[in-house]
Amino acid sequence: MRQAQKAMEPAFDQTTERIDSKPMRIDILTLFPEMCDTVLRESIIGRARERGLVELNCRNIRDYTLDKHNRVDDTPYGGGMGMVMQTQPIYDCFQALCGEVGRKPHFIYLSPQGKVLTQNRVRELAEYENLALLCGHYEGVDERVIEELVDE
């Protein structure tokens, strides 16, 4: 069964080897980093990490809150229904990432309104040396994050 599954997967050597020796760096900004760690060790992503093709890091947005309860949610700026992720912890997490990387990575907010992830889109994203992926929660993120930080 495993051999049949492996035969169906695309070969890394033919389609995804990076030309430069530096691995692509992807940082995931999330409220649930423990979920990321488990998933990123498996399958194609896990093998890419083992081969040094990609460096994946999960950042806990709660680590950047300023209150003792590590609160990340608030009512939407300007009013509205539900709760959204606050600007401050996301901003501080992203600034720490920029300082660590030495530049602003291409920043993508993952949401139902975003682009569909196709093979062609993956090829486009592979051109970036650094990607940061923001995982939303609640009713989404404060609109100021999208306007000020997010590239897509």
Identify the meaning behind each predicted range.
Residues 2-4, 9-101:
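N-terminal nucleotide/polyanion-binding subdomain common to many enzyme families
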Residues 86-137, 142-143:
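S-adenosyl-L-methionine/SAH cofactor-binding core of RNA-modifying enzymes
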Residues 146:
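Glycine-rich beta-alpha loop elements in corrinoid/cobalamin-binding modules
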Residues 150-152:
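A contiguous pocket-lining binding segment that forms or flanks enzyme active sites
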